[in-house]
């Protein structure tokens, strides 16, 4: 979150005022913690909502106990049902009525344990992805920002969601932060300056009325029944090719490393390089870090500056990439 805020200047316009933020599927609270560190403003109000579940594989607030005790401006929201379930209609209506048009920044960091079948992670996440977007639209202030974690962008439902966001925000970015593992499909959609639709209230009422249908299906396969803009689709294909190639190269590098006769030596060298890059990452974003003078620095391995592709939007439905 620190990297995203820095590279896309998400917080600059709030430097001289207080903020209200809402964090969906937030447990154990990493995004909130990052923002409280960056802002250092006790007058800000942070709201976190995540599924309350007894299973250990469901991220909760247990690891954040000390942090929550030390930050009175962080509020845990559980919704109407008391369990923070984003798939429940009652909770959507509750958040819409309580927080409508009030949140400057909304984040959505939801995910599942995909280790059983990584090939279906995009489909499995489709309902949660859709739910997070709907909750964001229910609470977003006009001109506000939204950060959404996604995985692959291949299925129609995910593409439809990105298209929807591109019509509701002034600019939309796809970003793969340096702190996100290259071999992982994880990436973030950053939406800036929410443009409230003229028919906003009727749109939200219609969505809420039909929201119960989300739980009647295994996956969401489609949102729109029309063909999307060709330029929009072409840009997504380009981004998928770039990020996919990075994944393939990293996975192949890992396989070759494990099969190498000099495996131990190469692993140690790789670890030193990674430590060096982590130190420079912390220095770049002005974060405290342990600087070990015994670490062999590599002068030409500085973390590259982010590059924004497609500086000038060529149509109303466009996305930019931060690579």
Kindly label every feature range from the protein language model:
Residues 111, 151, 194:
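Anionic group-transfer/hydrolysis microenvironments
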Residues 20-23, 47-48, 107, 145-149, ...:
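Beta-strand cores of modular interaction/reader domains in eukaryotic scaffold and signaling proteins
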Residues 34-37, 161-162, 266:
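Composition- and surface-driven signal marking solvent-exposed, interaction-prone regions
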Residues 3-9, 33, 178-323:
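C-terminal lobe and adjacent flexible extensions of AdoMet/dcAdoMet transferase-like proteins
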Residues 13-14, 33, 58-59, 118-119, ...:
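Intrinsically disordered, low-complexity regions enriched in proline, serine, glycine
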Residues 2-137, 154:
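The AdoMet/dcAdoMet-binding core of the Class I SAM-like
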Residues 119-174:
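Conserved Class I SAM-dependent methyltransferase catalytic core
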Residues 17-24, 48-53, 149-157, 162-164, ...:
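Short amphipathic alpha-helical segments embedded in low-complexity Lys/Glu-rich regions
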